[in-house]
Protein backbone atom coordinates (compact mmCIF):
# COMPACT_ATOMS: atom_id res chain seq x y z
CA UNK A 1 0.00 0.00 0.00
CA UNK A 2 2.81 2.40 0.88
CA UNK A 3 4.48 1.61 -2.43
CA UNK A 4 1.25 2.43 -4.31
CA UNK A 5 0.83 5.66 -2.36
CA UNK A 6 4.39 6.70 -3.20
CA UNK A 7 3.83 5.80 -6.84
CA UNK A 8 0.61 7.86 -6.97
CA UNK A 9 2.30 10.72 -5.18
CA UNK A 10 5.09 10.63 -7.71
CA UNK A 11 2.58 10.75 -10.55
CA UNK A 12 0.92 13.80 -8.99
CA UNK A 13 4.27 15.57 -8.65
CA UNK A 14 5.21 14.77 -12.24
CA UNK A 15 1.79 15.97 -13.43
CA UNK A 16 2.12 19.21 -11.49
CA UNK A 17 5.62 19.79 -12.81
CA UNK A 18 4.42 19.04 -16.33
CA UNK A 19 1.54 21.48 -15.95
CA UNK A 20 3.90 24.15 -14.64
CA UNK A 21 6.29 23.64 -17.56
CA UNK A 22 3.35 23.75 -20.00
CA UNK A 23 2.03 26.99 -18.48
CA UNK A 24 5.49 28.53 -18.61
CA UNK A 25 6.55 27.37 -22.08
CA UNK A 26 3.29 27.17 -24.06
CA UNK A 27 0.51 28.98 -22.17
CA UNK A 28 -2.98 28.77 -23.69
CA UNK A 29 -4.17 31.73 -25.74
CA UNK A 30 -6.71 32.68 -23.07
CA UNK A 31 -3.92 33.20 -20.53
CA UNK A 32 -1.93 35.33 -22.98
CA UNK A 33 -5.02 37.43 -23.75
CA UNK A 34 -5.50 38.00 -20.02
CA UNK A 35 -1.89 38.95 -19.27
CA UNK A 36 -1.56 41.23 -22.30
CA UNK A 37 -4.87 42.89 -21.39
CA UNK A 38 -3.72 43.47 -17.80
CA UNK A 39 -0.36 44.86 -18.92
CA UNK A 40 -1.98 47.18 -21.46
CA UNK A 41 -4.66 48.57 -19.12
CA UNK A 42 -2.18 49.14 -16.30
CA UNK A 43 0.40 50.74 -18.62
CA UNK A 44 -2.08 53.21 -20.09
CA UNK A 45 -3.66 54.20 -16.80
CA UNK A 46 -0.33 54.59 -15.01
CA UNK A 47 1.47 56.60 -17.70
CA UNK A 48 -1.47 58.50 -19.24
CA UNK A 49 -3.83 59.04 -16.31
CA UNK A 50 -1.26 59.03 -13.49
CA UNK A 51 -3.04 56.34 -11.49
CA UNK A 52 -1.35 53.79 -9.24
CA UNK A 53 -0.85 50.28 -10.66
CA UNK A 54 -2.40 48.78 -7.54
CA UNK A 55 -5.61 50.79 -7.97
CA UNK A 56 -5.83 49.98 -11.67
CA UNK A 57 -5.36 46.25 -11.09
CA UNK A 58 -7.88 46.12 -8.26
CA UNK A 59 -10.54 48.37 -9.78
CA UNK A 60 -10.20 48.16 -13.54
CA UNK A 61 -8.76 44.70 -14.16
CA UNK A 62 -9.67 42.36 -11.31
CA UNK A 63 -12.97 43.65 -9.92
CA UNK A 64 -15.09 43.53 -13.11
CA UNK A 65 -13.19 40.84 -14.98
CA UNK A 66 -12.78 37.11 -15.43
CA UNK A 67 -11.61 35.17 -12.31
CA UNK A 68 -8.30 34.52 -14.07
CA UNK A 69 -7.31 38.14 -13.40
CA UNK A 70 -7.16 37.44 -9.65
CA UNK A 71 -4.08 35.29 -10.29
CA UNK A 72 -2.23 37.84 -12.44
CA UNK A 73 0.59 40.00 -11.09
CA UNK A 74 1.95 43.11 -12.78
CA UNK A 75 5.27 44.93 -12.50
CA UNK A 76 5.90 48.49 -13.68
CA UNK A 77 9.44 49.33 -14.78
CA UNK A 78 9.72 53.10 -15.15
CA UNK A 79 13.49 52.95 -15.70
CA UNK A 80 13.40 50.64 -18.73
CA UNK A 81 13.85 52.07 -22.21
CA UNK A 82 11.06 52.37 -23.11
CA UNK A 83 9.20 52.15 -19.77
CA UNK A 84 7.08 49.02 -19.63
CA UNK A 85 4.57 46.94 -17.70
CA UNK A 86 4.87 43.17 -17.45
CA UNK A 87 2.04 40.86 -16.37
CA UNK A 88 2.22 37.13 -15.55
CA UNK A 89 -0.20 34.50 -14.35
CA UNK A 90 0.94 33.12 -10.98
CA UNK A 91 4.14 35.09 -11.43
CA UNK A 92 5.58 32.94 -14.24
CA UNK A 93 3.07 32.01 -16.97
CA UNK A 94 1.91 33.73 -20.14
CA UNK A 95 4.03 36.87 -19.95
CA UNK A 96 2.21 39.92 -21.29
CA UNK A 97 3.94 43.23 -21.97
CA UNK A 98 3.03 46.79 -22.83
CA UNK A 99 5.41 49.69 -23.40
CA UNK A 100 5.06 53.45 -23.07
CA UNK A 101 5.61 55.12 -26.46
CA UNK A 102 5.45 58.63 -25.03
CA UNK A 103 3.19 61.67 -24.86
CA UNK A 104 0.10 61.50 -27.07
CA UNK A 105 0.89 57.95 -28.25
CA UNK A 106 0.37 56.22 -24.90
CA UNK A 107 1.07 52.50 -24.54
CA UNK A 108 1.24 49.61 -26.99
CA UNK A 109 0.73 45.93 -26.28
CA UNK A 110 3.66 43.70 -27.28
CA UNK A 111 2.22 40.25 -28.00
CA UNK A 112 5.44 39.16 -29.72
CA UNK A 113 7.90 41.29 -27.77
CA UNK A 114 8.79 43.67 -30.60
CA UNK A 115 7.59 47.16 -31.47
CA UNK A 116 7.86 49.27 -34.60
CA UNK A 117 9.32 52.73 -34.12
CA UNK A 118 6.78 55.54 -34.03
CA UNK A 119 7.46 58.93 -32.51
CA UNK A 120 5.70 62.25 -32.52
CA UNK A 121 7.46 64.79 -34.76
CA UNK A 122 8.90 67.93 -33.26
CA UNK A 123 6.50 70.83 -33.10
CA UNK A 124 3.45 68.78 -32.11
CA UNK A 125 2.87 69.79 -28.52
CA UNK A 126 0.22 68.67 -26.07
CA UNK A 127 0.38 71.85 -24.05
CA UNK A 128 -2.99 73.58 -23.56
CA UNK A 129 -3.75 76.82 -25.34
CA UNK A 130 -2.16 79.84 -23.68
CA UNK A 131 -4.53 81.30 -21.13
CA UNK A 132 -6.82 78.26 -21.27
CA UNK A 133 -7.46 78.41 -17.54
CA UNK A 134 -9.09 81.84 -17.92
CA UNK A 135 -11.17 81.13 -21.02
CA UNK A 136 -14.60 79.56 -20.93
CA UNK A 137 -14.91 76.04 -22.27
CA UNK A 138 -14.58 75.07 -25.13
CA UNK A 139 -12.05 77.84 -25.93
CA UNK A 140 -10.42 77.15 -22.57
CA UNK A 141 -10.99 75.16 -19.39
CA UNK A 142 -13.00 77.55 -17.24
CA UNK A 143 -16.49 76.30 -16.43
CA UNK A 144 -19.37 78.29 -14.95
CA UNK A 145 -21.66 75.47 -13.83
CA UNK A 146 -25.42 75.89 -13.89
CA UNK A 147 -27.01 76.89 -10.64
CA UNK A 148 -30.28 75.25 -11.65
CA UNK A 149 -31.14 72.90 -8.78
CA UNK A 150 -32.97 70.47 -11.05
CA UNK A 151 -29.79 69.89 -13.09
CA UNK A 152 -27.73 69.44 -9.93
CA UNK A 153 -30.28 66.97 -8.57
CA UNK A 154 -30.09 64.88 -11.75
CA UNK A 155 -26.30 64.68 -11.65
CA UNK A 156 -26.36 63.85 -7.94
CA UNK A 157 -28.77 60.95 -8.51
CA UNK A 158 -26.58 57.82 -8.37
CA UNK A 159 -29.20 55.72 -10.14
CA UNK A 160 -29.20 58.09 -13.12
CA UNK A 161 -25.41 58.38 -13.12
CA UNK A 162 -25.07 54.62 -12.93
CA UNK A 163 -22.76 52.29 -11.03
CA UNK A 164 -19.07 53.00 -11.47
CA UNK A 165 -19.64 56.51 -12.81
CA UNK A 166 -16.35 58.38 -13.29
CA UNK A 167 -17.42 61.51 -15.16
CA UNK A 168 -20.54 63.30 -16.38
CA UNK A 169 -20.30 66.49 -18.44
CA UNK A 170 -23.37 68.34 -19.70
CA UNK A 171 -22.98 70.83 -22.57
CA UNK A 172 -25.93 73.06 -23.46
CA UNK A 173 -25.81 76.00 -25.82
CA UNK A 174 -22.13 75.34 -26.47
CA UNK A 175 -21.06 75.67 -22.82
CA UNK A 176 -20.56 73.20 -19.99
CA UNK A 177 -23.41 73.84 -17.60
CA UNK A 178 -22.74 71.02 -15.14
CA UNK A 179 -20.31 68.20 -14.43
CA UNK A 180 -19.69 65.53 -11.83
CA UNK A 181 -16.76 63.21 -11.18
CA UNK A 182 -16.33 59.96 -9.31
CA UNK A 183 -13.91 59.50 -6.43
CA UNK A 184 -10.26 59.82 -7.53
CA UNK A 185 -11.26 61.23 -10.94
CA UNK A 186 -11.54 64.83 -12.07
CA UNK A 187 -11.61 67.27 -15.00
CA UNK A 188 -7.96 66.56 -15.83
CA UNK A 189 -8.19 62.75 -15.77
CA UNK A 190 -7.86 61.17 -19.24
CA UNK A 191 -10.41 58.37 -19.65
CA UNK A 192 -10.49 55.50 -22.12
CA UNK A 193 -13.30 55.79 -24.66
CA UNK A 194 -13.06 52.20 -25.90
CA UNK A 195 -15.37 51.96 -28.95
CA UNK A 196 -16.16 55.68 -28.90
CA UNK A 197 -12.78 55.79 -30.64
CA UNK A 198 -14.52 54.35 -33.71
CA UNK A 199 -16.40 57.62 -34.24
CA UNK A 200 -13.15 59.56 -33.95
CA UNK A 201 -11.72 57.31 -36.66
CA UNK A 202 -14.68 58.15 -38.89
CA UNK A 203 -14.09 61.87 -38.32
CA UNK A 204 -10.40 61.54 -39.22
CA UNK A 205 -11.45 59.83 -42.45
CA UNK A 206 -13.89 62.69 -42.99
CA UNK A 207 -11.09 65.25 -42.90
CA UNK A 208 -9.39 63.37 -45.73
CA UNK A 209 -12.61 63.14 -47.72
CA UNK A 210 -12.90 66.91 -47.36
CA UNK A 211 -9.39 67.38 -48.72
CA UNK A 212 -9.98 65.00 -51.61
CA UNK A 213 -7.42 62.46 -50.47
CA UNK A 214 -10.01 59.74 -49.89
CA UNK A 215 -13.46 59.06 -51.32
CA UNK A 216 -16.26 57.09 -49.72
CA UNK A 217 -16.70 54.91 -52.80
CA UNK A 218 -13.04 53.94 -52.88
CA UNK A 219 -12.44 50.17 -53.23
CA UNK A 220 -9.33 48.01 -53.50
CA UNK A 221 -8.38 49.03 -49.97
CA UNK A 222 -5.82 46.29 -49.31
CA UNK A 223 -3.41 44.67 -51.74
CA UNK A 224 -4.10 41.29 -50.14
CA UNK A 225 -7.71 41.61 -51.32
CA UNK A 226 -6.82 41.82 -55.01
CA UNK A 227 -8.54 39.18 -57.10
CA UNK A 228 -11.19 38.38 -54.49
CA UNK A 229 -14.67 39.64 -53.64
CA UNK A 230 -13.07 41.71 -50.88
CA UNK A 231 -11.57 44.01 -53.52
CA UNK A 232 -15.06 45.47 -54.05
CA UNK A 233 -15.50 46.49 -50.39
CA UNK A 234 -15.80 50.29 -50.16
CA UNK A 235 -14.94 52.76 -47.43
CA UNK A 236 -18.65 53.56 -47.12
CA UNK A 237 -19.60 49.93 -46.48
CA UNK A 238 -16.88 49.63 -43.86
CA UNK A 239 -18.08 52.76 -42.09
CA UNK A 240 -21.58 51.30 -41.84
CA UNK A 241 -20.24 47.90 -40.70
CA UNK A 242 -21.55 46.07 -43.75
CA UNK A 243 -18.33 44.96 -45.42
CA UNK A 244 -19.33 41.29 -45.43
CA UNK A 245 -16.08 40.24 -43.73
CA UNK A 246 -16.30 37.49 -41.14
CA UNK A 247 -15.80 38.77 -37.60
CA UNK A 248 -16.62 37.68 -34.05
CA UNK A 249 -16.88 40.64 -31.66
CA UNK A 250 -17.49 38.51 -28.54
CA UNK A 251 -15.40 39.36 -25.48
CA UNK A 252 -15.98 36.31 -23.27
CA UNK A 253 -13.31 34.10 -24.82
CA UNK A 254 -10.52 34.11 -27.42
CA UNK A 255 -12.50 35.65 -30.27
CA UNK A 256 -11.51 37.69 -33.30
CA UNK A 257 -11.60 40.93 -31.33
CA UNK A 258 -9.68 39.71 -28.25
CA UNK A 259 -7.11 37.96 -30.45
CA UNK A 260 -6.64 41.14 -32.49
CA UNK A 261 -6.28 43.45 -29.49
CA UNK A 262 -4.04 41.24 -27.32
CA UNK A 263 -2.34 38.58 -29.46
CA UNK A 264 -1.69 40.23 -32.83
CA UNK A 265 1.18 42.72 -33.32
CA UNK A 266 -0.25 43.93 -36.67
CA UNK A 267 -3.96 44.32 -35.98
CA UNK A 268 -4.94 45.69 -39.39
CA UNK A 269 -3.23 42.83 -41.22
CA UNK A 270 -5.03 40.31 -39.01
CA UNK A 271 -8.43 41.92 -39.60
CA UNK A 272 -7.79 42.20 -43.35
CA UNK A 273 -7.02 38.48 -43.49
CA UNK A 274 -10.59 37.54 -42.53
CA UNK A 275 -12.62 35.89 -45.30
CA UNK A 276 -15.58 37.39 -47.12
CA UNK A 277 -18.67 35.97 -45.40
CA UNK A 278 -21.75 38.16 -45.98
CA UNK A 279 -23.99 35.77 -44.05
CA UNK A 280 -22.00 36.33 -40.87
CA UNK A 281 -24.20 39.06 -39.42
CA UNK A 282 -25.64 40.58 -36.30
CA UNK A 283 -28.58 38.62 -34.82
CA UNK A 284 -30.47 41.89 -34.33
CA UNK A 285 -30.24 43.09 -37.90
CA UNK A 286 -29.62 42.39 -41.54
CA UNK A 287 -27.26 39.56 -42.39
CA UNK A 288 -24.74 42.04 -43.73
CA UNK A 289 -24.52 44.22 -40.60
CA UNK A 290 -21.68 42.93 -38.46
CA UNK A 291 -20.23 45.22 -35.81
CA UNK A 292 -16.46 44.83 -36.03
CA UNK A 293 -13.55 46.44 -34.22
CA UNK A 294 -11.36 44.93 -36.92
CA UNK A 295 -13.09 47.13 -39.47
CA UNK A 296 -12.19 50.31 -37.57
CA UNK A 297 -8.54 49.29 -37.22
CA UNK A 298 -8.41 48.61 -40.97
CA UNK A 299 -9.82 52.09 -41.55
CA UNK A 300 -6.93 53.51 -39.50
CA UNK A 301 -4.51 51.68 -41.75
CA UNK A 302 -6.28 53.07 -44.83
CA UNK A 303 -6.13 56.70 -43.76
CA UNK A 304 -2.56 56.41 -42.47
CA UNK A 305 -1.45 55.29 -45.95
CA UNK A 306 -3.22 58.30 -47.47
CA UNK A 307 -1.24 61.05 -45.68
CA UNK A 308 2.28 62.23 -45.10
CA UNK A 309 3.39 62.26 -41.45
CA UNK A 310 0.48 60.03 -40.35
CA UNK A 311 1.63 59.84 -36.73
CA UNK A 312 0.84 63.50 -36.09
CA UNK A 313 -2.12 63.76 -38.45
CA UNK A 314 -4.97 63.25 -35.91
CA UNK A 315 -3.66 66.21 -33.92
CA UNK A 316 -3.05 68.46 -36.89
CA UNK A 317 -6.41 67.71 -38.50
CA UNK A 318 -8.69 67.30 -35.50
CA UNK A 319 -7.48 67.35 -31.90
CA UNK A 320 -5.45 70.58 -31.95
CA UNK A 321 -8.10 72.65 -33.77
CA UNK A 322 -10.63 71.44 -31.19
CA UNK A 323 -8.34 72.19 -28.25
CA UNK A 324 -8.31 68.52 -27.20
CA UNK A 325 -4.95 68.84 -25.45
CA UNK A 326 -5.47 65.64 -23.44
CA UNK A 327 -6.10 63.37 -26.43
CA UNK A 328 -3.90 60.28 -26.47
CA UNK A 329 -4.34 57.92 -29.43
CA UNK A 330 -2.60 54.58 -29.00
CA UNK A 331 -1.06 52.26 -31.58
CA UNK A 332 -0.48 48.57 -32.02
CA UNK A 333 3.04 47.14 -32.05
CA UNK A 334 3.22 47.66 -35.83
CA UNK A 335 2.57 51.39 -35.49
CA UNK A 336 -1.07 51.55 -36.64
CA UNK A 337 -3.53 53.59 -34.57
CA UNK A 338 -6.00 51.28 -32.85
CA UNK A 339 -8.95 53.15 -34.33
CA UNK A 340 -11.47 50.81 -32.76
CA UNK A 341 -10.66 51.13 -29.10
CA UNK A 342 -7.68 53.03 -27.73
CA UNK A 343 -8.20 56.75 -27.35
CA UNK A 344 -7.91 58.48 -23.98
CA UNK A 345 -9.13 62.01 -23.30
CA UNK A 346 -10.63 63.96 -20.45
CA UNK A 347 -14.42 64.03 -20.26
CA UNK A 348 -14.28 67.70 -21.26
CA UNK A 349 -12.30 66.81 -24.38
CA UNK A 350 -14.73 64.01 -25.26
CA UNK A 351 -17.41 66.71 -24.93
CA UNK A 352 -15.48 68.90 -27.38
CA UNK A 353 -15.59 66.11 -29.92
CA UNK A 354 -19.33 65.66 -29.31
CA UNK A 355 -19.83 69.39 -29.80
CA UNK A 356 -18.01 69.20 -33.14
CA UNK A 357 -20.52 66.59 -34.30
CA UNK A 358 -23.43 68.67 -33.00
CA UNK A 359 -22.08 71.60 -35.05
CA UNK A 360 -21.95 69.38 -38.15
CA UNK A 361 -18.16 69.45 -38.33
CA UNK A 362 -17.73 73.23 -37.98
CA UNK A 363 -15.46 74.77 -35.34
CA UNK A 364 -14.60 78.43 -34.79
CA UNK A 365 -15.76 79.35 -38.27
CA UNK A 366 -13.78 76.58 -39.92
CA UNK A 367 -15.15 73.37 -41.47
CA UNK A 368 -13.11 70.42 -40.25
CA UNK A 369 -15.41 67.90 -41.95
CA UNK A 370 -17.06 67.96 -45.39
CA UNK A 371 -20.46 69.57 -45.78
CA UNK A 372 -23.11 66.96 -45.07
CA UNK A 373 -20.66 64.40 -43.67
CA UNK A 374 -22.10 64.31 -40.13
CA UNK A 375 -25.61 64.14 -41.58
CA UNK A 376 -24.47 61.14 -43.61
CA UNK A 377 -22.88 59.56 -40.53
CA UNK A 378 -26.16 59.83 -38.63
CA UNK A 379 -28.44 58.56 -41.40
CA UNK A 380 -29.69 55.02 -40.70
CA UNK A 381 -27.55 52.43 -42.45
CA UNK A 382 -29.98 50.12 -44.22
CA UNK A 383 -28.00 47.06 -43.15
CA UNK A 384 -28.64 47.85 -39.47
CA UNK A 385 -32.43 47.45 -39.59
CA UNK A 386 -33.54 45.66 -36.43
CA UNK A 387 -36.21 43.18 -35.44
CA UNK A 388 -38.15 45.97 -33.69
CA UNK A 389 -38.36 47.98 -36.89
CA UNK A 390 -35.84 50.75 -36.27
CA UNK A 391 -32.22 51.14 -37.26
CA UNK A 392 -29.46 50.77 -34.71
CA UNK A 393 -26.50 52.21 -36.58
CA UNK A 394 -25.38 54.92 -38.94
CA UNK A 395 -21.75 55.22 -40.06
CA UNK A 396 -19.56 54.60 -37.04
CA UNK A 397 -22.19 56.14 -34.75
CA UNK A 398 -25.08 54.51 -32.92
CA UNK A 399 -28.66 55.68 -33.38
CA UNK A 400 -29.82 54.01 -30.16
CA UNK A 401 -28.38 53.86 -26.67
CA UNK A 402 -27.26 50.77 -24.76
CA UNK A 403 -29.65 47.86 -24.36
CA UNK A 404 -29.36 47.31 -20.62
CA UNK A 405 -31.80 44.56 -19.64
CA UNK A 406 -34.08 45.05 -22.67
CA UNK A 407 -34.43 41.70 -24.50
CA UNK A 408 -32.94 41.35 -27.96
CA UNK A 409 -35.46 42.13 -30.64
CA UNK A 410 -37.07 44.91 -28.59
CA UNK A 411 -36.50 48.66 -28.79
CA UNK A 412 -33.94 49.69 -26.13
CA UNK A 413 -35.32 53.25 -26.18
CA UNK A 414 -39.00 52.38 -25.72
CA UNK A 415 -39.01 53.38 -22.04
CA UNK A 416 -37.61 56.84 -22.79
CA UNK A 417 -38.74 59.94 -24.66
CA UNK A 418 -35.60 61.06 -26.46
CA UNK A 419 -35.71 63.37 -29.50
CA UNK A 420 -35.64 61.64 -32.87
CA UNK A 421 -32.28 63.18 -33.84
CA UNK A 422 -30.41 61.73 -30.85
CA UNK A 423 -27.25 59.81 -31.70
CA UNK A 424 -24.57 58.13 -29.63
CA UNK A 425 -20.91 57.35 -29.31
CA UNK A 426 -20.77 54.13 -27.30
CA UNK A 427 -17.86 52.33 -25.68
CA UNK A 428 -17.22 49.24 -23.58
CA UNK A 429 -17.99 49.37 -19.85
CA UNK A 430 -20.40 52.28 -19.99
CA UNK A 431 -18.73 55.02 -22.05
CA UNK A 432 -21.17 57.26 -23.94
CA UNK A 433 -21.35 60.64 -25.61
CA UNK A 434 -24.93 61.58 -26.48
CA UNK A 435 -25.52 64.28 -29.09
CA UNK A 436 -28.96 65.89 -29.59
CA UNK A 437 -28.74 68.71 -32.15
CA UNK A 438 -32.39 69.76 -31.78
CA UNK A 439 -31.79 70.43 -28.07
CA UNK A 440 -28.29 71.89 -28.52
CA UNK A 441 -27.19 69.26 -26.01
CA UNK A 442 -24.17 67.00 -25.53
CA UNK A 443 -23.96 64.63 -22.57
CA UNK A 444 -20.78 62.73 -21.73
CA UNK A 445 -21.05 59.84 -19.29
CA UNK A 446 -17.98 57.72 -18.53
CA UNK A 447 -17.29 55.03 -15.99
CA UNK A 448 -16.47 51.43 -15.28
CA UNK A 449 -19.88 49.87 -15.74
CA UNK A 450 -19.87 46.32 -17.15
CA UNK A 451 -22.85 45.41 -19.32
CA UNK A 452 -24.11 42.91 -16.75
CA UNK A 453 -25.04 45.88 -14.53
CA UNK A 454 -27.78 46.63 -17.12
CA UNK A 455 -27.27 50.39 -16.86
CA UNK A 456 -28.92 52.57 -19.50
CA UNK A 457 -27.66 56.19 -19.75
CA UNK A 458 -30.86 57.02 -21.63
CA UNK A 459 -32.45 57.70 -18.24
CA UNK A 460 -29.85 60.35 -17.43
CA UNK A 461 -30.17 61.98 -20.84
CA UNK A 462 -33.97 61.86 -20.77
CA UNK A 463 -34.05 63.58 -17.37
CA UNK A 464 -31.69 66.31 -18.59
CA UNK A 465 -33.72 66.92 -21.76
CA UNK A 466 -36.90 67.34 -19.72
CA UNK A 467 -35.26 69.57 -17.12
CA UNK A 468 -33.75 71.87 -19.74
CA UNK A 469 -37.12 72.10 -21.48
CA UNK A 470 -38.76 73.07 -18.19
CA UNK A 471 -40.90 69.94 -18.04
Where are these regions (language model features)?
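Beta-lactamase-like hydrolase cores
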Residues: 134-173
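Conserved catalytic neighborhood of penicillin-recognizing serine enzymes
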Residues: 226-287, 294-297, 345-348
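Structured C-terminal helix/loop/strand segments within mature extracytoplasmic catalytic/sensor domains
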Residues: 30, 422-471
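Active-site-proximal alpha-helical segments within enzyme catalytic domains
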Residues: 201-202, 294-304, 341-363, 431-447
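Active-site SXXK
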Residues: 174, 191-217, 238, 299-303, ...
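Active-site helix/loop module of the DD-peptidase/beta-lactamase fold
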Residues: 210-246, 276-281, 305-345, 372
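Active-site Gly/Thr loop motif
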Residues: 324-331, 379-442
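Short, charged, amphipathic alpha-helices and their helix-cap/turn boundaries
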Residues: 151-157, 175-180, 254-284, 309-327
Amino acid sequence: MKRIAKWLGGLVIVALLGAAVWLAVAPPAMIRVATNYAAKIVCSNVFIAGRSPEAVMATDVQAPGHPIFKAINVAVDRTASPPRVTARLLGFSGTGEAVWRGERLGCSSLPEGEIADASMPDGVSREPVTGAADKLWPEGERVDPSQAPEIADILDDSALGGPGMRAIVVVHGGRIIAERYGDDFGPQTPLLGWSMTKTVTAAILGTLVKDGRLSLDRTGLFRSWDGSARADISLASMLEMSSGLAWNEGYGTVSDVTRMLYLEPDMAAYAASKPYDPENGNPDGDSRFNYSSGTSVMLSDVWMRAVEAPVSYPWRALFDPLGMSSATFEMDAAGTFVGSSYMYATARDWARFGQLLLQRGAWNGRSLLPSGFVDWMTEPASASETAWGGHAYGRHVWLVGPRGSVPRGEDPEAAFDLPADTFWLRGHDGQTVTVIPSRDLVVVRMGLTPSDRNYQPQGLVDALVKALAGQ
